Amino acid sequence: MSKIKISDLAKEFGMTWKELAGEIEELTGKTVKSPSTKIDEEIVSLLRDVLQPAEEVEEAVEKKVEKEKGYRIFELSHDWNIPFEELAEDLKAIGYTKSIDNFTILDEETVNRLKDYIKEKKEKEKEKKKEEKEEKKVKVEKKVEEKPVEVKKEEKKEEKVEKVEKKEEKVQKKPEKKEVKRKEKIVAKEEKPERKKAVEEKPKKKEVKEVKKVEKPKVEVVEEKEETKIKIPEAEIRKETKEEKAELEALRKLMGPQPKKKKKKKKKKEEEKAPVETKEKEEELKIAIIPEVVTVRELSDILDMPVNEIMAELLKRGILATVNQTIDPEIALQIAEEHGYLAEIQKEGEEVKIVEELPQEEKKKLLGEEEEEEENLVERPPVVTVMGHVDHGKTTLLDTIRKTDVAAKEKGGITQHIGAYKIKLSNGKEITFLDTPGHEAFTTLRARGSKVADIAVLVVAADDGVKPQTVEAINHAKSAGVPIIVAINKIDKPGADPERVKRELAQYELIPEEWGGDTIMVPVSAKTGQNVEELLENILLVSEILELKANPNRPAIGTIIESKLDPKRGPVATVLIENGTLHQGDYFVAGFTWGKVRAMFDERGRQVKEATPGTPVEVLGFNEVPQAGDKFVVKPSEREARLLAEQRKQKYEEELQAKRTRIHLENLKDVKEINIILKADVQGSLEAITKSIEELSEKFEDVTINIIHSGIGAITESDVMLAAASNALIIGFNVRPDASARKAAEEEDVDIKIYGIIYDLIDDLEKALKGMLTPKEREVLLGICEVKQIFRIKGVGTVAGCMVTEGVIRRNAKARLVRDGVVIYDGEITSLKRFKEDVKEVAKGYECGLMLKDFNDIKPGDQIEAYEIVQEKAE
């Protein structure tokens, strides 16, 4: 007796083997566990008698499907031109609680409820759009009154609106026709013999179409689309084989509703083209001003459209662009108009103007210096600049106030850079201090410090009296209109004579209060802290009299106090906020530079998110190193900041080029020239040295010193090659040449001079110009070692564990510690060991331990250069 596999039998009945196994268990009580199980012929016969043949099952299923197919969600989505997601939301809105997917079948009652809900929703949307349209028309009319040229364009658009509204009345009848079509489709499927009849009725509709075509040609597109849709049920009504059904089902699951929707939209665009789109655009009419230079992202913001949509519009035009790439303004104009905007192109010059060329009132407004309303102002900390002669104790005084040891880090105790610090007193009051360099070379920095300060503290040593730089500081403070408080320092020293200082200051119209004048003079000792509290109280007193206020709720403006190029963080600047609040992420312009605030740090190196008026912060995010003293102004966009900076720079370069051309044409044959390449550690030092060299050049009529290049950071190979090409001398201030630069200098025979004190630099240059150089000292590099590890030994100090990478390291040799190309220390090696033994020298490739004289701030990665000074005859 032959047996049949249950899997084969399941195919015959159009069932899965598990479903068939269930039927067998119900009829016979036998359990089937595998699709390969074979069934006796008797059971097969019983199943064939009991179960309906597969073909009949198929017909029944087909009838059921055909009867209910019109109510599947994906069909409704397709025919009603409503996205599946929107239909699903509408179903939830009418209280449909079952799970929803593309093939969910809805009963007739649910479909009717859904249809009524959608119709009601569309009516509400239509009313809302009409109201919005009226509001927009009013706005456009106002715009037209301002711009008469656009009246014709507006009239044309109004005519289009009327035409489209007429057409809309006909298009709105579409859902009813679709419903008739749906009913015809259901009847056609229930009564299969009448299919041909339904097809034969089509020509009647075509006749109607032709009559309408004579009256209103535009209706033809709509009617043809309806006729095209009637063919859909004809294609679907045909009987499908099981394989075709399976393929169709799989295809539908894969495709989902989205591809159909896209295809439909595309077809709709091709058939209907502009008319319906015009209606939508007219209803959403907006104004857009397109800048002459615009990026994809900026256009996205202007049109309030996603970036990917803008990029898609560009792709349609064959343009592949990134988000930050600029695009043709005409293309941007086309995109704007296609999305319902009245758009025009605005020229660059209409938006961004060079501040220096503006009238005074407009310039103040652009720089944020216009008068603020009283109700917006709040009290701000006073900004105090500390001024005075060299070594009169300015930095030591600040150290006493801040309880920090900044002076120990300065070269020879002389302040080389402006520092800015905000301190909080015990009474909760805050004061911002500027530590301005006191010696003559820093005149420009000191002048700059006076301008940003509210109060000047003039430090005069009680044992030294008034000096030339003291007088200069007085003049700067007076010219800036800054009140002066005199701190007579070093009263603890033998020979201190505060009364003598008062007499000398009286000659410069600084009369002490006890003599009937209005200048506050406080005798202090920065070393012991005597009377420092009294000095701070007087600063706060003057601050109250000045009524210092600012508006923290506006974009920030400030001044660049100091700037430098950090090897790891890029261009960095200390900014003193004078008005407004600076936030992380703000766009700004400062002189020729611009950028975005990437990060901010306070005077203690802590990161902050915002900076209020009177606060100094270190700002990261400049496109290049700004000039100290430049005005720092926050701008609303990157584009505006960038354009303003570029225009300023271009104007400056044009003026500079014209100036250089005049100098060369008039004096090139008549003067001797010395070309110099100048590199320094910070911007302030660079400016001070440049000014000193210019003053030196003026003393010698027959010699001109040209600084052909200057910059911040280590001396590089490109600097050496420039010097070789222009026969120039390289001068480094607190910076060193890197390895490639040293090698190139030897090969090209380029002279590199390194200095740590400005006086020495200027003195050497002056002697060279006079031809009076005495037998000079020359530096000879002995070797270089890299710090690998540090050891802190109690009572001894810091020992640096090093690897010698070049030459030899000798005990008692002079040593220079270089960190990121900047000289941190210059002294000598006091101890040199290999393991535990003292040695005289350590050669390349060996490890050693060494100590530096009076210096413990050594870090792994630092380079220590050992060198010696040899005497040479002057050439």
Swiss-Prot record:
PROSITE patterns on file: G_TR_2 (PS51722), IF2 (PS01176)
Region described as G3: spans on this chain: 435-438
One Pfam family per UniProt: IF2_N
Keywords, comma-separated and alphabetical: Cytoplasm, GTP-binding, Initiation factor, Nucleotide-binding, Protein biosynthesis
Renumbered residue ranges of the record's region G2: 413-417
GO molecular function, one term: GTP binding
Family: Belongs to the TRAFAC class translation factor GTPase superfamily. Classic translation factor GTPase family. IF-2 subfamily.
Protein name: Translation initiation factor IF-2
